[in-house]
């Protein structure tokens, strides 16, 4: 599965209610650190097409970003990545800690 842009709470809720695991990235389109994190996320998604991968652009979907922070009790940061499994945050991190290797490590 290719990575998919999510823009609404309804889309996110539909994904989060499903069984299994998925990766979710919140990023800024104007921040160089965020662009580097997106590159790592993109590399992961391209190498692991069996793992659903979603993202949002904070500037265009701030209400969704806030909803995710409130739902999971994780303070908003950007960039920020989550591994969510069966409705629970299995792992999250932000900024330069977002690497393809880190995502792979925490997925297993």
Swiss-Prot record:
The keyword Oxidoreductase applies. GO terms for biological process: cell redox homeostasis; response to oxidative stress. Keywords: Oxidoreductase, Redox-active center. It comes from the Bacteria. Disruption phenotype: Cells lacking the operon including this gene (ytxGH-brxC) have increased S-bacillithiolation of glyceraldehyde-3-phosphate dehydrogenases (GAPDHs) GapA and GapB in cells with increased basal levels of oxidative stress due to concomitant deletion of genes encoding for catalase (katA) and alkyl hydroperoxide reductase (ahpCF). Pfam families: BrxC (PF11009). Disulfide bonds: none annotated. InterPro entries: BrxC, Thioredoxin-like_sf. Coiled coil: none annotated. GO terms for molecular function: enzyme binding; oxidoreductase activity; translation elongation factor binding. The modification S-bacillithiol cysteine disulfide is found at residue 31. Cys can react with bacillithiol (BSH) to form mixed disulfides. S-bacillithiolation protects Cys residues against overoxidation by acting as a redox switch in response to oxidative stress. Gene3D superfamilies: Glutaredoxin (3.40.30.10). S-bacillithiolation is the formation of mixed disulfide bonds between protein thiols and the general thiol reductant bacillithiol (BSH) under oxidative stress. BSH is an equivalent of glutathione (GSH) in Firmicutes. This protein is a monothiol bacilliredoxin, which debacillithiolates (removes BSH) the S-bacillithiolated glyceraldehyde-3-phosphate dehydrogenases (GAPDHs) GapA and GapB in vivo and probably a number of other oxidized cytosolic proteins. Debacillithiolates the S-bacillithiolated Bdr (Bdr-SSB) and BrxB (BrxB-SSB) in vitro. NCBIfam families: B_thiol_YtxJ. Interacts with AbrB, BdhA, Bdr, BrxB, FolD, GapA, GapB, GatA, PfkA, PyrAA, PyrAB, PyrE, PyrG, PyrH, RpsB, RpsK, RpsL, SalA, SucC, Tuf and YtsJ. This is Monothiol bacilliredoxin BrxC. The lineage of its organism: Bacteria, Bacillati, Bacillota, Bacilli, Bacillales. The gene is brxC.
């Amino acid at each position: 599965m290719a990575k998919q842009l999510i823009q609404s709470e309804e889309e996110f809720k539909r994904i989060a209610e499903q069984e299994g695991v998925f990766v979710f990235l919140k990023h800024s389109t104007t921040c160089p650190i965020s662009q580097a994190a997106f590159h790592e996320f993109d590399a992961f998604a391209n190498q692991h097409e069996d793992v659903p991968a979603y993202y949002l652009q904070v500037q265009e979907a701030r209400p969704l970003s806030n909803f995710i922070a409130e739902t999971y009790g994780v303070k908003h940061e950007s960039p920020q990545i989550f591994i969510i499994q069966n409705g629970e945050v299995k792992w999250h991190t932000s900024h330069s800690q977002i690497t393809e290797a880190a995502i792979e490590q925490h997925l297993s």
